[in-house]
Amino acid sequence: DPKFIARRMVIFASEDIGLAGNGALSLAVATFEAVERVGLPEARYNLFHCAIALARSQKSREITDLMNDAIALARKYPNSPVPLHLRNAPTKLMKDLGYNKGYKWQAGFQHEKGFLPEDIKKD
């Protein structure tokens, strides 16, 4: 089934190429759409194009490793609270409780407070 092959290419693009080739996912998704719209036999060109590009791409398992680490931490600490400075403060009560206190947008500077709950930081 050509859709199954194209679907596996989409998964491979993130799972095995990931950040080493940021264009791989876009190509794989475009290939999947082409297979759906064009159909066989012409979609073979799209499948071969994508297969060759994915095979030639540098590979990285960084996304898989980081995702698995994040899932393991979430399972280990299922009830860790969101740090107060990251919580939305739409009411005066929430502001008085310290929600969103000291929050600064991350871009352009080092964030001294961090984003992880205290118990996870210690792990």
Residue ranges of each PLM-predicted region?
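Terminal-proximal interaction/regulatory segments of ATP-powered molecular machines
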Residues: D1-K122
